[in-house]
Amino acid sequence: MLKFNFIILFVFGIFASSFSQIGPVKKKNNSCTEKGEQRRKNIKYAEWECGKKAGTVDCNEKLSYNQDNNTFLAGMDGTPYNGKCETCHNNGLIERTVSFVNGKEDGIDTTTYQTGCIQVVRAHIQGIRNGQWIYYFDSTAQMAWEMNYFVGQQHGKSIFFTKNGDTTLYENYNNGLLHGLQKTYHPYLKSKIQKEVNYTNGFLDGSYKSFNEKGIVIQDLNYKMGKKDGEFKYFYDDGTLLRTEHWKLDIKEGEFKTFYYGGFVQDHETYKKGRKEGVAEEFYADKKLKHKTIFKKGEIIEEYKYDEHGKETYSFGAPEGKDGEKEDDDVMSGQSKVKKKKKKK
C-alpha cells in the first residue's frame, strides 16, 4: 500500500509540464504569497495550522492506500476511512484537506504550494474523477491547465496555458474520446496556431490543417472517421502548392501530383481503387521528360527512361513495328523508318 502524499503528487506531476493562445487568462493578484512570505521571515514563531480541526486526521500518518481497489484505509484493521484528512507543508501552512466516504475521495479539494498559493483544485465522486480540475502555476495564480471529467472520463473542454497566459492546446472530449475541434499552437509564439483538427468520438473526421510559424497553411487534409478521404494538399512554406493527392477511405483514388516550386509538374500518377492506372510521368527541373511508365491494373505495361538531354536510356514493353522490330530501337540508333512505295506493274 502507498502513502497518501505520494498518490497526490504523482497525479499532479503528470500534467505539470504540459503547457500557447486562445487568449490569455486573467491572473489573480499575488496576495496568495503573503502568507508564505510571513512564514519564511518568522518561521521560528509560526503557528502550525494542522491538527486544529476536530475529527480531521493527518493523511500521511493515519491513512494508507490500497491501489488494488483505489481505497484509503485507517486504523490497525485497515477499514475504509470516512471523514477528512489534512497535510501541512514544512513551514506549517495547510497543504491540502481531503474528504472521504467509504475510503474514497469525495467532493472538491484544494492543494496549495508552500507559498500559500493554490496549486490544484480537484473534484471526485466516490473516488472517481468528476467535474472540473484546475492546476495553477506557483505564485502567479496563473492557470496552467483545466480539464473536465464525467464519471472518470475526460468530458468537455481541456485547455493548457504557458506561464504568460497564452494557450498551447485546446481540445474537447466526449466520454474519454477526442470530439470536436482541437487547436494546437506554436510554442512561445503568441496567437500563432500550429494545427487545427476535427474529431468525432476519437477519430479524425473532417478538416485537418497545419500552419507554419508565419500562419501560412502547409497542409490542408480531410478525413472521414479516421480515414483519408478527399483531396490532400501540401504547400511550400510560402503557400505555393507542393503536392496534391486524392483518397477514398484510405485508398488512393485519382491523381497524385507533385510540383516544382515554379509551379510546373515534377511527377504525376493516377490510381484506381488503390492501383496505378494509365500514364505516370516524372520531369526534370527544365520540364524535360525523365521517366514515363504506363500501368494497367497496377502492372507495368511500358516503361521509358531519359537522360537530361532527352536521350532514351531504358525501355521496356515498347510497341513493335510491322517488321517485328521495336520502334524505339530505331530511335535509339538515330534512324527513322520510311515506308517504301510499291512499284506499279
Features from the language model and the residues they span:
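Bacterial Sec-dependent N-terminal signal peptides
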Residues: 1-25
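Glycine/tyrosine- and acidic-biased, solvent-exposed loop/turn segments at the edges of beta-strands
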Residues: 18-345
